[in-house]
């Protein structure tokens, strides 16, 4: 399973990229708004850091297919690695079909059911993004959805990749890997959590103590 980082914060992206563990970035209107910067400026800066798929979403106020297609084409022009992120709606599927036929990569987002994922894949989506944590929030096991989508895509040999989104903790990441997600897009804080374990910390401190006992500081 591959790791993307889910943020529009350039400093977080630089730190994660320096670890050598991420191979793509996902953003959304909320993450861009949080940075308080121009969309194109932020996205261009990100493409200069990470050499991999960069998801940039159409505006939250864009609701009709024609507008999504127009905006998607502009997003795709920013860089060859751009992926146009489109909401899972009837109009979104129409836009996905057209953009995919034009060779533009698409990421259908806000997926909460296997049927939605299957429709997006049939429309030509490069990626689908089921939201794990948000399903958990309403007492519906999000990991079951990831597993079901993975099974369906495997049965029908669909090329669309699953990006597990709304990942909240390291357990989610392990579960997604076991459930067959191709990618987990993860906040920087969760990536850092994954590097830690109390026994690792204890082992490092023991090595330090043993070294100092023999060689001093």
Swiss-Prot record:
The keyword Transferase applies. Pathway: Carbohydrate degradation; pentose phosphate pathway; D-glyceraldehyde 3-phosphate and beta-D-fructose 6-phosphate from D-ribose 5-phosphate and D-xylulose 5-phosphate (non-oxidative stage): step 2/3. One of its GO terms (molecular function) is aldehyde-lyase activity. GO terms for biological process: carbohydrate metabolic process; pentose-phosphate shunt. One of its GO terms (cellular component) is cytoplasm. It is found in: Cytoplasm. Keywords: Cytoplasm, Pentose shunt, Schiff base, Transferase. Its EC number is 2.2.1.2. Its main location: cytoplasm. Pfam families: TAL_FSA (PF00923). PROSITE patterns: TRANSALDOLASE_1, TRANSALDOLASE_2. It catalyses: D-sedoheptulose 7-phosphate + D-glyceraldehyde 3-phosphate = D-erythrose 4-phosphate + beta-D-fructose 6-phosphate. It comes from the Bacteria. It is an enzyme of class 2 (transferase). The active site is at 85 (schiff-base intermediate with substrate). Belongs to the transaldolase family. Type 3B subfamily. Transaldolase is important for the balance of metabolites in the pentose-phosphate pathway. This is Probable transaldolase. The gene is tal.
């Amino acid at each position: 399973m591959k790791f993307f980082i889910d943020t529009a914060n350039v400093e977080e992206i630089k730190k994660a990229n320096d670890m050598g563990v991420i191979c793509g970035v996902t953003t959304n209107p909320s993450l861009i708004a949080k940075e308080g910067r121009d969309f194109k400026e932020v996205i261009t800066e990100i493409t200069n850091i990470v050499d991999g798929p960069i998801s940039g979403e159409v505006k939250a106020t864009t609701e009709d297919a024609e507008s999504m297609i127009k905006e998607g084409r502009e997003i795709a022009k920013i860089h060859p690695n751009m992926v146009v992120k489109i909401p899972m709606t009837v109009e979104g599927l129409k836009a996905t079909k057209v953009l995919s036929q034009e060779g533009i990569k698409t990421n259908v987002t806000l997926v909460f059911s296997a049927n939605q994922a299957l429709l997006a894949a049939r429309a030509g989506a490069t990626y689908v993004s089921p939201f794990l944590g948000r399903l958990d929030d309403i007492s519906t096991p999000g990991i079951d959805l990831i597993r079901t989508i993975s099974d369906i895509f495997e049965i029908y040999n669909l090329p669309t990749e699953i990006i597990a989104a709304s990942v909240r903790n390291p357990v989610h990441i392990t579960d997604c890997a076991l459930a067959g997600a191709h990618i987990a897009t993860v906040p920087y804080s969760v990536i850092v959590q994954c590097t830690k374990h109390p026994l690792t910390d204890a082992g490092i401190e023991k090595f330090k103590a043993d070294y100092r006992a023999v060689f001093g500081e």
